[in-house]
Amino acid sequence: MLMSLTDSKEGKNRSGVRMFKDDDFLIPASGESWDRLRLTCSQPFTRHQSFGLAFLRVRSSLDSLSDPVKDPSSPGSSGLNQNSSDKLESDPSPWLTNPSIRRTFFPDPQTSTKEISALKGMLKQLQPGPLGRAARMVLSAAHKAPPASVVSPNNSHGEPDSSHPERAEPRAEEPNRKNNASRGKRRKVQEQRRPLSSSSSQPNRRATGRTKQRQQRPQAKSDGSGVQATGQCPICTGSFSIEALPRHAATCGESSPPQPASPTSLSSSESVLRCLHVALTPVPLIPKPNWTEIVNKKLKFPPTLLRAIQEGQLGLVQQLLESGSDPSGAGPGGPLRNVEESEDRSWREALNLAIRLGHEVITDVLLANVKFDFRQIHEALLVAVDTNQPAVVRRLLARLEREKGRKVDTKSFSLAFFDSSIDGSRFAPGVTPLTLACQKDLYEIAQLLMDQGHTIARPHPVSCACLECSNARRYDLLKFSLSRINTYRGIASRAHLSLASEDAMLAAFQLSRELRRLARKEPEFKPQYIALESLCQDYGFELLGMCRNQSEVTAVLNDLGEDSETEPEAEGLGQAFEEGIPNLARLRLAVNYNQKQFVAHPICQQVLSSIWCGNLAGWRGSTTIWKLFVAFLIFLTMPFLCIGYWLAPKSRLGRLLKIPVLKFLLHSASYLWFLIFLLGESLVMETQLSTFKGRSQSVWETSLHMIWVTGFLWFECKEVWIEGLRSYLLDWWNFLDVVILSLYLASFALRLLLAGLAYMHCRDASDSSTCRYFTTAERSEWRTEDPQFLAEVLFAVTSMLSFTRLAYILPAHESLGTLQISIGKMIDDMIRFMFILMIILTAFLCGLNNIYVPYQETEKLGNFNETFQFLFWTMFGMEEHSVVDMPQFLVPEFVGRAMYGIFTIVMVIVLLNMLIAMITNSFQKIEDDADVEWKFARSKLYLSYFREGLTLPVPFNILPSPKAAFYLLRRIFRFICCGSSCCKAKKSDYPPIPTFTNPGARAGPGEGEHVSYRLRVIKALVQRYIETARREFEETRRKDLGNRLTELTKTVSRLQSEVASVQKTVAAGGALRPPDGASILSRYITRVRNSFQNLGPPAPDTPAELTMPGIVETEVSLEDSLDATGEAGTPASGESSSSSSAHVLVHREQEAEGAGDLPLGEDLETKGES
């Protein structure tokens, strides 16, 4: 029950009741006995409004229903308030007056032998067999409870009498002594397990101090207030102070079995599980750590710990952690109840520094001696992942699992979004260990985390209004947005796609489409989403490149994933191809998802080209002249070829015409014949002008092209049937076809309407004016809305669009296809430019028209239509500027000239040049990526001719073929004769696909085996990809190591020259300046050490300077020579120096070859300057 602070203090809103059922529990806990309850309360986050769970009372089915919550105004409670009025005045705690707290912690004694027996019977009914821990606790409390006659009225509420303060002290000391004894035994066992170097007497003294502190705490309070108020725990029957009693009751029985009770303790046996009461909001208590969080901060941070970790001094680190105090006397140690934020940050930095420097032994010591909380382990995991240390990651995960007794609650990593204590870390919001490992493509660590159950939760949609998203937005909007971006970076990484997806290629396609949509919905982060989309496309491209034979290529490109069958973009992928052509479902899905890199891959293009040519093996290698000759022959013989296929589709000629390239040439020849007929109609209109000038021409003379239009209409209807309406309308060429056909049909309908009107009006009265208008009237007598006017205009527009439709076949040629794509992009830019153009043009149109309307001095200004034409042609320099002159009206003339000049500057100089720049930019983008763009467009053209059917071109497709009649009769026969259930089994849309080397494999295994083979191929490709990525990573690191070694060689040579110059100066007896010389050497040594601090961790108990043999010797010898004023020091000779540098190179190269993952030591402090 959620209550505000005010409600919890005043005791309001306490009427909520919730009955638990079996469905409320998890499957493993369903039907089992339980002794504790974990309740999670949530509500929309409000920054300036506090909330919390005031009181929680859990009752079992055995509780008496006749024991309602007493009202504060009841007699019992009023008497209690009167007896404790003095105490409440001195310590006004709001929760102390609550009836639930009074009844729970100070109950009336009602125990007897019969009640105990009945209670034991009820416990047996609840849990057959051996009694559980909760049942034993209840029975222990009932056995130790005294009879009701022994307890005084004041003690019936669990509050000691003020006249007998000595009775409360033994009750408080007895359980404390026993608790301290048990803790001492446990500490002795732990001390025996510790190494000998870490043994000391500090822990014992610390334990003794804590015991004395607990024993003296009630006395100190009694000295201050005069009377010490104590209560007894109903679980362990121990006596504790009023302030410590709720805290103890919340944790009683968690770490140890119930302690023996004092004879004066009280208990209640009315219920089994009604004794758990928690106060969260009104009482500032330290929460007990639950199973999803580790909270145990005991040690005060020693100031010298960071320096000891930096220097790799393992012994000092162990001494600081085990003693709990600073040996230098900087500060006392010991346990701390409340750790400040600075302390928490210091412990984090210590663990992070040990991990970052690669000190695995020190890291183990920190993890063994300090109990870090979940947030600290979370940040340490991020550091271990960032420095690529799988061993440390494995230790941290094991630490979490050991502390919690189960696997890590991976959802807690996502909940770190609300943890403000990690805002000062070096990692961005929303970055989890798995996300960071995937972003860095650390496959080993990512696989390790996934094996532990870690996952990356996919972010909710942008418009999601759920409780989690609304709280995150209100908590921190920027942090929420950055968390989404970082999560998508992990999901779109190569490691996550490879390891977390069953079909990595399909997952990359779908994620790329999702990121493209997010780029449109969230323009603030469009560059980031576009970069991630490009990463997904590159991954699919690289994964396809892992194929090693044609069988793998066939399995990858010819299967549709199960998850994508419900996607809108997958509509139409079930269409069948011609016999002998694989379905290429995955390739078509890539085209629908706009995966240009994948489609333009050489493997995909090779497959498409081989299918495109079919059995014409010599077509690809033939010259352009030969191809043009074959195309011209097909153009001339197109009618005869179509008739031959119409009569015998299964003949050799029919199978030859089904080859995609010949089908393409056949359809292109048909469309060229259609355009020739359009040109012929235009020429006939010029030669027979007298006939077409009036209404003497017939409908059929002007509508011969309708034969092709009818064929086009039937062709488009079959395409909609095969592809689906949505997939059909997504193609802009199909949209253009719909417009062209609509205009042709409208023009033909208007001509039919005109002929029908003439027939109807002349049938009864042939001499009427209406009949004369529709038959013999001259063109000058026609009305503006005459149907023939509209028909001729529509036919003219449609003829123009029909010729532009010829650009559809241009992608078949490389140069023409690239130009066609560039023109399409330019048209897109011009459409967007027209919006700005119309806004500015309309603004100046209204201004100039309003100036010249009252004067009417010129024909081109003062009228809206004329002014628009004047301004439009002015943009192209086809108008005279003297049109705006009005000499007799000076002011309007000046304003008109000024506006016209500004219009010329804005439109001609600015906007037109901007349009030219936009068009040039679009053309350059296409030209830079011309190969990919052209191959993608050509692939779409190829796939459109792979489909089954649609072999006969227009207009021969409108003739009912014998093949169509045969198929129709076969379907009718099957429907009538084979209507049994055995014949209704649906054939798989994707049967086993034969390879190109084995065409007879169509009668292969079933669909399930084929799908499993496809998944095996995908897994093999992913494994090859991971191995290739690891080899490239090792090669890059090896090259980087070589560069570092080269830099080290140059630095050592410079250092030797400096040493030689110093030797000469000392030998000549010149004046030395030790600080300057020391700073020079320190600078060189610092550079060398910083360059090599990533090559491996230093040895334990060894300063960082001693990890470079050969260089430190020179430094030490030089320091000796500088200290001995006037005495010539003899450092290593040139031969020894060269050998030292060679030793450094060999030694470090061996270390680099043996080191697996080299940590980064960015925070290592140098000690060169002294």
Swiss-Prot record:
Disulfide bonds: none
Chief place of localization: membrane
A GO molecular function held by the record: damaged DNA binding
Organism domain of life: Eukaryota
Coiled coil residues, start to end: 1030-1068
Annotated transmembrane regions: 628-648, 659-679, 702-722, 738-758, 789-809, 833-853, 899-919
SMART domains listed in its UniProt record: TRP_2 (SM01420)
ANK repeat copies, ranges: 300-329, 346-376, 377-405, 429-458
Topology relative to the membrane: Multi-pass membrane protein
Extracellular face of the membrane: 649-658, 723-737, 810-832, 920-1170
Record keywords: ANK repeat, Calcium, Calcium channel, Calcium transport, Coiled coil, Ion channel, Ion transport, Membrane, Repeat, Transmembrane, Transmembrane helix, Transport
Localisation: Membrane
Intervals, Cytoplasmic compartment: 1-627, 680-701, 759-788, 854-898
GO cellular component, one term: endomembrane system
Tissue/organ expression: Expressed exclusively in vomeronasal organ neurons (sensory microvilli).
Regions of compositional bias (Basic and acidic residues) in chain numbering: 158-177
UniProt GO BP: acrosome reaction; aggressive behavior; calcium ion transmembrane transport; calcium ion transport; female courtship behavior; inter-male aggressive behavior; mating behavior, sex discrimination; negative regulation of male mating behavior
Region (Disordered) residue spans: 64-113, 142-231, 322-342, 1118-1170
Biased composition (Polar residues): 74-85
Role summary: Thought to form a receptor-activated calcium permeant cation channel. Probably is operated by a phosphatidylinositol second messenger system activated by receptor tyrosine kinases or G-protein coupled receptors. Is not activated by intracellular calcium store depletion.
UniProt family annotation: Belongs to the transient receptor (TC 1.A.4) family. STrpC subfamily. TRPC2 sub-subfamily.
Official protein name in the record: Short transient receptor potential channel 2
Organism of derivation: Rattus norvegicus
UniProt lineage: Eukaryota, Metazoa, Chordata, Craniata, Vertebrata
